[in-house]
Amino acid sequence: LIRDFIISNIKEVMTKYGFQYLETPSFEYTDSIGKFLPDKERPDQGVFSFKDENKWLSLRYDLTAPLARYVAKNYLEIPKPFKRYQLGTVWRNEKPGPGRFREFLQFDADYVGTKNLQADAELCVLISEILEKCGLDKTDYTVKVSSRKFTDKLFEQLKIKSKDQISTTLRALDKIDRLGWGEAKKLLGEGRKDKSGDYTKGANLKSDQIKIIENALKSKTPDSEDVLEIIKIFQAYNFKNYKFDPSVIRGLEYYTGPIFEVNLNFEVKNSKGQAIQFGSIGGGGRYDNLVSNFGNLDCPATGISIGLDRLVFALMQKKDFKIKSTRPVIICVFDKDKTKEYVNILNKLRASNISSEIYPGEGKLKKQMGYANKIGLIVKRKNSY
């Protein structure tokens, strides 16, 4: 019910903002999407794959790489800019946890074919509107903004040139919001063993390099032109629910400019009632070079996404969260010979657009009432009509 409520609000907002809906396939060739995964040197890591007639296929890891392939194939036919959104299942071959799933429904919104940073700013604004329509208050979340240009300068300062070391460092920094600086710091060094005993190899940075990163992440003032421009546009929209945060990295290598992350400001607990570091419920950024990987095209783009199942998990944590809904009706069966009368009542209810059903099983009133109670229906009692 909560998921349907969120989807309904997403569709309403996206229609208002003039986005078109686009569906992409669940499977992609592994060698096509592998280059966009967090570890492109090992494209089979993090995805579910199988071999089909000497070709490796993978369940999509996200909705962005499939979109890039679609745009490259249909570049001449689609309008530019192309404003697209999608709701679709994605799969991650990763360790699950509270609010983290191997299969989950994701929402994506993208602007393709424009370098104008108003597109980036508007994506943050529309995400904010969706979250508030779904029941979050302005104080419940923050849209954090940074830029990949910040990390580019940082890597120059660190004198890191190895692509493998750069990607490992990006993945480590991307985990700060979920693991905290102390644990992420281990991933910047030799590596980290989690509570289950699984070991993740680190970036093998030296202590002085890690110190440079730590100091850089304390910056409170943006110095990149793209972030400053986006903040100006936020002001034009009167959008105030944002914060510059250089620790927003995003682990995928295809980001080229501004990056965003949506974080919750209230405590989230696991099934044992323990407070956890939940991480973000969504994020995105500019990926100006991604489409060109599928064709010789200059096609800038930017996008943002929300993990719906993570949002559902978060909304369920709010004590004051309620969905206004009209409960359906069940008509209990007392006499099988009066089926015609029951159907007449059913038809009247459905003609008034009231969700209703005749009890579909067999059993006495107690059993029927138990069924109605378990599925939360209003019960139609004898002689009420």
Predicted features, each with a name:
Residues 15-30, 44-46, 59, 78-83:
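Short N-terminal amphipathic alpha-helices
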Residues 2-17, 28-29, 64-76, 84-137, ...:
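Positively charged, Gly/Ser-enriched RNA/tRNA-binding surfaces
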Residues 43-54, 158-184, 239, 268:
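Acidic, His- and aromatic-enriched active-site or binding-groove loops in soluble protein domains
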Residues 24-32, 82-93, 141-151:
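Short, glycine/charge-rich beta-strand/loop segments that flank catalytic centers
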Residues 138-149, 170, 243-249:
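Short, surface-exposed recognition loops or helix-turn segments adjacent to catalytic cores
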Residues 26-57, 185:
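Polyanion/phosphate-binding surface patch
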Residues 148-149, 153-160:
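Phosphate-rich ligand and nucleic-acid binding surfaces
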